[in-house]
Amino acid sequence: MNKTAKALIDFLYKSSILESGVTSKKKKTRQNTQNRKERKEKMEKVKKQAKIWLCIGIALMLLASIVVSAVQTSGGKVTMKELAFETDSGYTMSAYLFIPDTATAENPAPAIVVSHGYLNNKEMTDANYVELSRRGYVVLSIDQPDHGDSDVIENFVTFMPDGVYQAVLAVSRMPFVDTSRIGITGHSMGSWSCNAAINADNLNENRLISAVLIHCNDPIYTDNDGNFTNAYGGRDVGVVSAQYDEFFHGYVDDNGVTRQAPYYMEGKNAQSFLYFGQDPTGLEARQAHTYYTETIDGEEAIHVIFRPAIIHPWSHFSARSASYIIDFFEHAFGAPNPIAPTNQVWQWKEAFNCVGLVGLVLFICSFGTLMVFTPTFECLRAKEVVQPAKVTDRKGKLWFWLSLAAGALFGSVSYLTLVSWGNKMSVSQTEAMGLGLWSTGCGLFAILSMVVFYQCYGKKHGMDLAELGVKMPAKKLGLSVLLGVIIAVMAYVCVFTADYFFYADFRIWTLALKAFEAPMLKYLPYGLLFITFYVASSVATNCFNYNEIGGKSWVNTIIVALFTTIPALIIPWIQYIHYYSTGSMMWANNLATGVNLPMYVLWLFPIVLILFFSTVINRILYKVTKNPYIAGVVNAIIVALLTITNTCTTVV
């Protein structure tokens, strides 16, 4: 082969390689361009969907507020007002006043004061105030002192709060109230307040209270010497006694055996009450759900005990209990607008309170998503929608399941101990302290488990903490905290708007996001006890447990959320399965030590939903930001506010 031919072959060969290289480079460039375009389109789709969900969330909150307002005002037939009045005891009390159109100075109506229980507020009595006001009664639903929007006072006594009596004095001065027909009722601590009101009213020559319904508490059985008595005189008296009440209706029988609420009707206390204060020894046993009458001071009085087969906190969320309350006051006073006790509408209010809560969760997720598309916070947005990590080896899967199980186990075994410690401390809010200590403990355990996971497995398998969002520059972290605060503030703007225009809040049973007075903000430092857990939970949920285990992304989210809620599920399950099957609680109230274990178990009911949906919020915001701290801050602030505004605050 001559030199010319060889040179030609070399030229053609090199040209083909060069052309191939150029072609490959062009293909790669085109592929990268296509990938960027697809990522951008996916992010635009996320933005578009977030706008839609934001509108849906706002619409749900608005719809919920309108329906709630319509139900609690009986479609405009009842005027609802929020009052803040100075009591004769010198503190300011907050209350809702319901005035039916039929109640006037010319035609005064019977009035009923209703009270919530310990750690609750006036909004929790909605079944009572909705149903009683639609039947024509004037209703005053109060915030007890140290609760809700009422003043925090120095001499508050849990066993003898005077809120009910102060409310009785207030309604007795209203021109549209028939002062010969004033009734009182309260759930749990609210019934202690009712008994205190009876004692105060007994000192008056002209008594104001004509009827009292004790709800999930004990009536007065004995005098100061321990002898059976009828402290209520000629008043009509009823008792709603939950068959599985965790706190009341217990007694010691003749054999020295401590009996709990399931055996209440067999004891002397219940029988003495139904015999109007007589010693029931040797008398025929009287029955629940039967009205017994006796003439006292020339007037016929009634005593009755109702026994719904429910637990203590369910009674203020129960159609059966509501029907008993309606029926009792119908017997005592006669309703101005008689409606069958089973004809109830308060459930619609509660249902739409829950719709509003769903709308608020949608608002938080969608508003937070849209904020990272703004110029100020766009640096927090991920380059693409975050995808779950691949876990291909058996060890990785084992670490996933073991870490989730370990967290659930620690949360379960530590709960009662840590909450008890917090509740014994001399602080203004023992509930917030107890739950905060538990949250901190669980948060520290989560951090420890993540460190162990990273050192033993993640680091060896190329886990990049900066890439996952665990590590980030201080400026970006500060911006993340700021955005979290803004989202939480805007969520509460929605809550306050619903309260201002509609007297509505967003709740389901004992979980409630409600408006509050400015002084409550000084208790926000309790939030520092919650931040460790909710930030650590977000980091664990997204940076360590967001993977393909479970198949689809949403399945993985559900798995992680369910494991997070296990402590709040398993403890009540054990408590109530044991209670229903044996008639005694696994964790009973210890009066000697002051450790109220049944109360601590009840605190877990709203936490089930809090833990589940906070995990969902974590995941949704992480997928668009690759940043676990935004959602952690949002959840910590909201849970802290939810806790400090739905409890008892004392002076220490």
Residue ranges and their predicted role:
Residues 46-86, 94-96:
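An N-terminal hydrophobic leader/cap segment in hydrolases
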Residues 41-50, 347, 388-395, 471:
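Short, Lys/Arg-rich N-terminal segment immediately upstream of the first membrane anchor
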